[in-house]
Design a protein with these regions (language model features):
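Short beta-strand/loop motif that positions the catalytic acidic residue
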Residues: 93, 99-101, 105
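Catalytic active-site module of serine/aspartate enzymes centered on a nucleophile-bearing elbow/loop
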Residues: 124-125, 130-169
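Conserved hydrolase catalytic core segment
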Residues: 1-35
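Active-site nucleophile elbow and catalytic-triad environment of alpha/beta-hydrolase enzymes
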Residues: 72-89
Length: 169
């Protein structure tokens, strides 16, 4: 499971470790560069220049907070990153996927989660959360928990059914 950039990282893990990855869940994950993402990053870059804002990142990244911020913003805003996509990895994913995305996500349009579905041959469930922005787990934690639980329960039932069928062979 991964959120935002972590969703991309989780996707790469699912692509590389197909035999070991049983499921992939992403939330608010980018699958490509688009202007909505870039404008959100430009805005965040300006916000983090304000007094006290970098301290929010220091809570998670300590003294490397500025480096983390610069690595994120400068990579995404660079000309070299302009045509980046996850497509080559998404095409390799075989495990079931749950793709969660806020309808009003200010960093990524609905094209982001739809690209996951379009580019991967894996069985997938796209869950668009209505009236939700970039932080579904904070905005509607109960709904996120419910949809993830339901997905994992179905996966468990399928895995047990598949395991039982294999034992009978």
């Amino acid at each position: 499971m991964g959120r935002r950039v972590g969703g991309g990282m989780a996707s790469c893990c699912a692509a590389y470790y197909q035999e070991r990855c049983k499921a992939l869940i992403t939330m608010s994950a980018q699958s490509m560069v688009e202007e909505l993402t870039l404008s959100g990053i430009r805005e965040a870059k300006e916000i983090f220049k304000q007094d006290g804002q970098l301290d929010r990142l220091k809570k998670y990244h300590g003294e490397k907070a500025q480096w983390v911020l610069d690595a994120w913003t400068e990579t995404w805003l660079s000309e070299a990153f302009k045509h980046w996509t996850l497509d080559e990895y998404l095409q390799k994913i075989q495990c079931p996927m749950l793709i969660i995305h806020g309808e009003l996500d200010e960093y990524g349009s609905l094209n982001q989660p739809q690209q996951y579905i379009k580019s991967s041959p894996a069985p997938s469930q796209l869950y668009i959360m209505e009236n939700t922005h970039h932080m579904p787990h904070k905005e509607k934690p109960e709904e996120v928990l419910a949809v993830v639980t339901q997905f994992l329960e179905k996966l468990t039932d399928f895995t047990q059914l598949n395991h039982t069928a294999n034992e009978q062979v």
